């Protein structure tokens, strides 16, 4: 029987933070930010968002070779604030892993002295932690496939 090779997907970061928006504000959350987006929201923060000829897009002139990690990138005030999640020039900074490896990394960021196994239901406090897929655009077919693989793992 031939061993099937698990497909790899690009992501920009996996991190743990507190949810800051909506009904679940304040909930501890593991995040995976996928790479790729079919939207390029260049009008954000522009003086005239209706006129693309006037757009100032700092990410276009940024020297990507000046950083080694996504975490070291600046947050741009104009255009898409997460353009690094879709602009091809930043692809070399992205993680490229199988869903199984991504799932393991998600569990690892949940591990603490009181949650040694990285469970989404904290064993002591019984506090639920969430998993949020973000982007880029997690609903693109690559994000959907990776998400399903992570859930299965």
Language-model-detected regions and their locations in the chain:
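Conserved Radical SAM active-site core
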Residues: 2-5, 9-12, 39-153
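Short amphipathic alpha-helical segment that frequently serves as the phosphate-/nucleotide-binding helix
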Residues: 27-29, 147-148
């Amino acid at each position: 029987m031939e061993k099937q090779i698990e497909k790899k997907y690009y992501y920009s970061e996996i991190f743990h933070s507190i949810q800051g928006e909506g009904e679940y504000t304040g909930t501890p959350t593991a995040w995976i930010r996928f790479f790729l987006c079919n939207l390029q929201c260049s009008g954000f923060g522009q003086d005239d968002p209706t006129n693309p000829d006037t757009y100032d897009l700092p990410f276009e002139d940024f020297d990507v070779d000046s950083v080694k990690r996504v975490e070291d990138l600046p947050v741009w005030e104009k255009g898409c604030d997460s353009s690094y999640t879709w602009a091809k020039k930043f692809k070399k900074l992205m993680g490229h892993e199988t869903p199984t490896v991504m799932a393991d990394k998600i569990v690892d960021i949940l591990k603490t002295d009181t949650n040694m196994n990285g469970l989404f239901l904290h064993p002591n406090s019984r506090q639920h932690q969430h998993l949020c897929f973000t982007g880029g655009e997690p609903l693109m077919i690559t994000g959907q496939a990776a998400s399903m693989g992570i859930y299965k793992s």
